[in-house]
Amino acid sequence: MKFTIGWLKDHLDTQASVADIAEKLTALGLEVDAIEDPTAALAPFVVGHVIEAGPHPDADRLKLCRVDSGTDILQIVCGAPNARTGLKVALALPGAVIPATGDVLKKGKIRGIESQGMMCSTRELGLGEDHDGIIELPADTPVGVPLVDVLALDPVIDIAITPNRADALGVRGIARDLAAGGLGGVIADTLTAIPGRFPSPIGVAIDPETLASGACSHYVGRYFRGVRNGESPAWLKDRLNAIGVRPISLLVDITNYVTFDRARPLHVFDADKLTGTTITARPARQGEILRALDGRSYTLDAPVVAIADGAGPQGLGGIMGGEDTGVDENTVNVFLESALFDPANTAAAGRFLGIDSDARYRFERGVDPESCLLGAELATRMILDLCGGEASELVIAGAPPVWRRTIALRPARVARLGGVAVERAEMVAKLRALGCTVEDDGAEALRVDPPSWRVDIGAEHDLIEEVVRLHGFDLVPAVPLPRDPMPKAVLTPGQRRMITVKRTLATRGMLEAVTWSFLPRAVAKGFGGGQDALVLANPISSDLDAMRPSILPNLIAAAGRNAARGYGDLGLFEVGPRFHGGEPGQQTLVAAGLRAGKIAPRHWSRPARDADLYDIKADVLAAIEAAGAPTASLQVSADAPAWFHPGRSGQIRLGRTVLAAFGEIHPAALALLDVKGPMVGFELDLDALPLPKGRPSKTRPPLTLSPFQPVARDFAFVVEAGVAGDAVIKAARGADKALITDVVIFDVYQGDRLEAGRKSLALSVTLQPTDHTLSDEEIEAVSARIVGAVTKLTGGSLRS
């Protein structure tokens, strides 16, 4: 929110300096972002007098001028159409920096004629957007004096407004705060109601549905006839230019001025462009189209409030007017709108349309509910004074919403919540200075009625904040944080397990990724999700509209982005939630991993190979083992979800519980994400892992080593082709759990030397005695039990 010091002093009687005003604003919570002093950039400029202006000998559009700078007569080549003899101008001498461009002015030749200076336009001085001609100063302006002494430029203060302080989005609201803070007094408002000269030929109405919802609760209108919509006076243009608002025409500038002066947005229609005799605030109908004042066309729907005439929507309530009924230089009859729109509805409509405007910025924060009539009367006075014409009687629909409220303020609570002791009398004085009505009958609590413009004050704690704010945040004593000894941080078993899994995957060369918990619904459907319960009602982006049923698509997309930037060989993992329902608790914590490209960089000692099924299986088994699950009891089956390759994937179970799925990502799943493969991945359900029994201990169990030599024996079994290798391993391991410490498959054969539909699995079994060296008889006995177990449980036979 920007304002000039002169503008502020229209509302605040004070002799305070700019520095004092800025300091007080920050102390009151209206933080000053910047103080702009336009005089600093204009210091080198002086008032010049055009003694003679004649044609340039070599250019029809240029003029050759002799200009008195007060100390010298300069020859200046100028292209401005209004350059003429006798004109007083803003003169830049060589060495001056032009504010609009930052260029240093130098003497130079223009079409063969030396130019020794520059006569400047408003835009070149950074004072506005007008560049059709050079600045024309009053004829009695002294020659050679500094330009800043003539222009009487005001410093501009820019403050940051918190969302609750809608009242400070107008200069008068800022003046009220400064006065309440002890920096001067608010100048009384002398505005009086202006009687209408004739009945308004245009009426106003609020649709019952719109009125009932509160989307528009109060609409005040007024008709003006015989107005002149010309250029605004200099004082009005200067104020708007100073705060960054481009002057357009008298009528538009007046509505903009009231918006920033009183935080009261207004709108004016060209009455001759309206159809019918009634303007209605109603819900927008689906498919209606309006071309707004920003030159863009918008398709309307709820929750937009359409300001409509007999032909359809002519404005977007609380946001922006329509181009078709906008005023222009030919306008002679206008209709003024001063209405009240609901903050939440205006915010929703603005987001739906994608429009940011000064009106929306104020309405969605809350405009003074009593300001419709005030805004209409203030605009009426300015229109009649500056544009002439006659005003009709007011036409009104609806009424201000009920805003009066009485809040009990217990002075004792101020010290408790605010952290500072404030005398009761000071509280009363501060709140009354703020515009509140305060009743103090000596009871425990004060009875406080906030003013209409402070829509943010609704409870006792709001009043306490105001008391402390006006008393001074800097007077709140600093209290050191307590230094009581705190217990050491305690992690739950689940948290410890999550950290352990992360570290394990990181040590295996994977990089941790953190991705969104949502993804496109079409992608979610390809990974078992996309149900209505998992679709977001208000997504942060249209392509992130569903909660993720799996982390894998996010990792696949991340790997694809890395590959597009030249990093195709990588491993990623993420630990986070996946969602299988829309209710609380319908989510699980999972660890997901993905490998793409080569498993290791190229090296002369070994050929490079792509990451495969067995690499990712080793990753997930390492994570399961690190989490403390009984790996010896795991079973592997080939029934992974559909987004895995059916012949190169599997699931890991503990009993009937599915712990993880792993394998090569299905080409269709990669195509859904527009990513090239192959890629392998896994997803481990951490919530499904059994928690460790007993209390955790920081001490490791003793390392038990056998002093006796281990014994390895190899076996080759012929089994049906459909028998899983894991089944053979488990059968062999179960033959003697005390002696057998490891079983691995080191060879698989299917070929002509075996019957069709059968395969050979070669196993290496390690026996580790603990109390004596095994004899040949003991080894043969264990071997026989191994053969018997595999034959019984898998139907296989020892290969001869």
From Swiss-Prot:
It is an enzyme of class 6 (ligase). The keyword Nucleotide-binding applies. Residues 402-478 form the B5 domain. GO terms for molecular function: ATP binding; magnesium ion binding; phenylalanine-tRNA ligase activity; tRNA binding. Coiled coil: none annotated. Residues 706-799 form the FDX-ACB domain. It is found in: Cytoplasm. PROSITE patterns: B5, FDX_ACB, TRBD. Its EC number is 6.1.1.20. Belongs to the phenylalanyl-tRNA synthetase beta subunit family. Type 1 subfamily. This is Phenylalanine--tRNA ligase beta subunit. It comes from Rhodospirillum rubrum (strain ATCC 11170 / ATH 1.1.1 / DSM 467 / LMG 4362 / NCIMB 8255 / S1).
